[in-house]
């Protein structure tokens, strides 16, 4: 049984939290003992965006976009209720509950330890996580909960399309409420660089390879060639970020835990909200499970990229998004176990 529960998740994915901690330590040590590296990297910027970081993020996101079959959009009418739950929770509820929960903890509960200025930047990072529903890892969570594969593909594809239109205005609105000045052009450029370009490249690559070698070759062989690229891209990105975050982490180690608290609470809340609504409207379990998972998990790669572009590599906002990476896997694996235990509740008479 244990083997089966882990069959859909790779060794790297299962221990992502461990790798994040290791990368934190490596990055902090490099930044402390080799400060010249940070100074050199500061010169490799264009329009405020770190070129090395942009390349690493493309390496991460490009393989994810290749996995999404946008032709599946034609099947959007087969599970409309499940998709409506996903869209409403992801875009009309989740960003605003993240804002509310994070604000409450950063400005009220943790005000003894977090200054108002830091709280504002941590909130900005949390908002970026809350507005970006998960893309690649949803396939893993869906597999572990025995979700409907066809529905999972459609929900991921549709949400990726919605990101193109909804991400910028929602982020702009919520950060504006927090009196965080975000240039619209910078925000739009971030989405163009880190969503539109890899998305277009992924679609084109998929079409060309499938046309030449077939779908089976693409999904069974070609995609797996990029598994290590995504892993390396994520690890190097984390090391790069923590090179600049070292002083912040060393001065405020408790803040890592404080940031994690509202992120974890939000994850559980959104999962049970979507999962519960699916139960109320009597959707089958294999639809309800992935519907809950996509809202609960975050597109943390995009959140990290936009945080760095908007606020800088050494910003508290960027730190908040990396804490999202730290908590993602253990929390989601817990939700997988909960979902599987509640499977019997979705058998209707």
Where does each model-flagged region fall?
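Alpha-helical transmembrane segments of multi-pass small-molecule/ion transporters
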Residues: 1-66, 71-296, 300-349
